[in-house]
Regions:
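TerminUS-proximal long segments
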Residues: 168, 172-213
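Extended hydrophobic/aromatic segments used for targeting, binding, or gating
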Residues: 61-64, 69-75, 80-88, 94, ...
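Aromatic/basic-lined ligand-recognition segments
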Residues: 73-79, 134-170, 183
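Core segments of cupin and vicinal oxygen chelate
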Residues: 24-70, 107-110, 114-117, 125-136, ...
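Residues forming anionic-ligand binding surfaces in small-molecule and nucleic-acid pockets
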Residues: 7-15
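Vicinal oxygen chelate
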Residues: 15-26, 83-117, 169
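Short, small-residue-biased leader/transition segments that mark boundaries at the very start
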Residues: 1-3
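Active-site lining segments that contact anionic ligands and/or coordinate catalytic metals
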Residues: 57-59, 68-70, 95-97, 164-167, ...
């Protein structure tokens, strides 16, 4: 391998940074919203109230004025939960996960899986069985989604034939408590609202398996 090859290694198909998720102490969400809003002119575009099997969280999704930088802010609903666990392990507030975007999520996920990346537990079989009811008219390959546990969300194929689909999958923690999200957007600009609870419960299950609760 020549020096030039080492300087420009082959990629795995991720082309842009989609968003960063910021975990904060309970009660600090408004403070951090003011920070991003006052200094960088961010605005709120989504608010989530998520309840898992044992714990819950609030999430306030922000975007920059140009719309290209997005930062959801998360805080726990109670005194215990995955955000509290993160804050203890991270020893403070910080980035929970980094989302990177692909043009072909199936190929990219196959590649990084072969390289040893491990993923959060996938959803049950019924999730895929009912995917056409949730995301109308989608023609995503169910077998390839199930292979690694890729999630699907969005409005599907809407009036006029426009496609609004989001595909996403999450790694297990790789840098302390930090993990990665791998995402492909097909006309959908959301955060996978329909999958948010599935992700929350997957993290919850992994933490329970480690004895964190």
């Amino acid at each position: 391998m020549c020096i030039r090859d080492r300087a420009h290694p082959a990629g795995v198909g991720f082309h842009y940074l989609d968003h960063l998720t910021h975990n904060v102490f309970k009660g600090n969400m408004d403070k951090w919203f003011a920070f991003y809003s006052d200094l960088f002119n961010f605005r709120e575009i989504r608010f989530f109230d998520i309840q898992g099997k044992h714990t819950g969280l609030f999430s306030r999704a922000l975007t920059s004025a140009c719309g290209r930088i997005r930062i959801p802010i998360n805080e726990d609903r109670g005194e215990t939960g995955q955000i509290v666990n993160y804050l203890k392990k991270y020893k403070g507030e910080g980035i929970q996960h980094i989302a990177v975007g692909a043009h072909d999520i199936y190929s990219s996920v196959d590649t990084i899986s072969d390289l040893g990346v491990k993923f959060m537990p996938g959803p049950p079989e019924v999730y895929y069985t009912m995917s056409h009811d949730r995301v109308v008219g989608h023609d995503e390959p169910i077998d390839r989604m199930k292979k690694h546990g890729i999630l699907i969300d969005g409005e599907g194929v809407v009036d006029g034939g426009e496609t609004k689909i989001l595909l996403q999958i999450f790694s297990k923690t790789v840098i302390g408590p930090i993990f990665f999200e791998f995402i492909q957007r097909k006309g959908d600009d959301g955060f996978g609202e329909g999958n948010f609870k599935a992700l929350f419960e997957s993290i919850e299950a992994e933490e329970m398996s480690r004895g964190d609760y």
